[in-house]
């Protein structure tokens, strides 16, 4: 709990500094500009610092709050309209109000069959989890969730028990190496434990070797390479944040994957995989070049 408060204090403090830095730069410039009036390099440096600061402010306060919808069609053999949300990271960076906005948008999607929440639901949360995640209770469609590494102490606090209870109280079905059958859609859904937390039970998948219409939810897309003698029709994942700070030619080196996943659709030897770039942030509190996303996946 102490770590929770330290992380939140650090984020609030650095965010405050970002906001006041332009004022400090302006005051500094006003104070010393007469000494450097005839030096173009000085003006270039000042302009550069202002631009960098405003870019950081945009990446901290503006782009993370832009929520877009992305539509994708995938051939799977079963027909469904799935809303995929991932990595909301409610806690240090994203608030309950942010989650309310997400749920409002999800509820406005026509003809959705169900919602998948692909893990990393929290990020150093403070307070009662049931209250923090209460917007989930307003979902108009069934919702199925798995945990991510930040929900399973890899890294982060170990809050699995509390999180499971909070999700269930808010009408979200929690799956950890568990399955359910959606009879109306004829789809078998398996939700796996987190890969980084070493909680993936591949034996659970062995039960579905000869089953058609198999949908797997796994937080990290790398999980598919732990599948043994099975090839699901579709695996839904998150975890990558699409790089989060999407600087061309650089961001891919910082994506937490061993197999080159970024965001979007992949056809692999282990089956079809769709990776959401998600809604939240970890590490640096910035999101740039990759707005928060709600994925709408129509399978056929």
Where are these regions (language model features)?
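Binuclear metal-dependent hydrolase catalytic cores centered on His/Asp/Glu-rich metal-binding motifs
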Residues: 155-171, 183-218, 224-226, 287-288
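Membrane-embedded segments
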Residues: 78-173
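Active-site neighborhood of phospho(di)ester-bond hydrolases with catalytic His/Asp-centered motifs
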Residues: 83-86, 114-120, 142-149, 175-178, ...
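Conserved beta-sheet core of the metallophosphoesterase superfamily
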Residues: 221-298
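Beta-strand-turn-beta hairpins that frame and shape the catalytic cleft
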Residues: 73-83, 172, 179-190, 209-212, ...
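Solvent-exposed loop/turn segments at secondary-structure junctions
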Residues: 90, 121-124, 149-153, 180, ...
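Non-catalytic terminal accessory segments
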Residues: 1-68, 110
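Extended recognition/assembly regions associated with phosphoester-bond processing machinery
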Residues: 15-17, 68-73, 206-213, 217, ...
């Amino acid at each position: 709990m102490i770590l929770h408060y330290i992380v939140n204090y650090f984020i609030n403090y650095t965010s405050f500094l970002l906001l006041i830095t332009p004022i400090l730069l302006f005051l500094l410039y006003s104070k010393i500009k007469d000494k450097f009036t005839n030096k173009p390099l000085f003006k270039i440096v000042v302009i550069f610092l202002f631009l960098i600061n405003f870019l950081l402010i945009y990446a901290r306060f503006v782009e993370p709050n832009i929520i877009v919808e992305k539509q994708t069609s995938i051939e799977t053999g079963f027909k469904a309209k799935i809303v995929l949300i991932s990595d909301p990271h409610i806690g240090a960076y994203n608030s309950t109000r942010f989650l309310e906005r997400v749920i409002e948008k999800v509820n406005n999607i026509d003809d959705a069959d169900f919602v998948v929440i692909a893990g990393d639901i929290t990020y150093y949360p403070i307070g009662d989890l049931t209250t923090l995640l209460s917007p989930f209770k307003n979902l108009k469609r069934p919702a199925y969730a798995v945990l991510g590494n930040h929900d399973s102490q890899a890294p982060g606090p170990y809050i699995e028990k509390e999180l499971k209870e909070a999700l269930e109280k808010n009408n979200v079905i929690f799956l950890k190496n568990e399955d359910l059958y959606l009879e109306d859609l004829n789809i078998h859904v398996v939700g796996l434990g987190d890969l980084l937390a070493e909680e993936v039970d591949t034996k659970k998948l062995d039960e579905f070797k000869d089953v058609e219409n198999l949908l797997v939810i796994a937080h990290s897309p790398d999980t598919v390479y732990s599948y043994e003698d099975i090839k699901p029709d579709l695996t839904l994942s998150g975890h990558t944040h699409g790089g989060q700070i999407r600087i061309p030619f650089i961001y891919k080196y910082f994506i937490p994957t061993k197999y080159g996943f970024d965001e979007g659709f992949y056809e692999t030897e282990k089956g079809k995989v769709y990776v959401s770039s998600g809604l939240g942030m970890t590490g640096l509190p910035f999101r740039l070049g990759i707005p928060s996303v709600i994925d709408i996946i129509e399978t056929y």
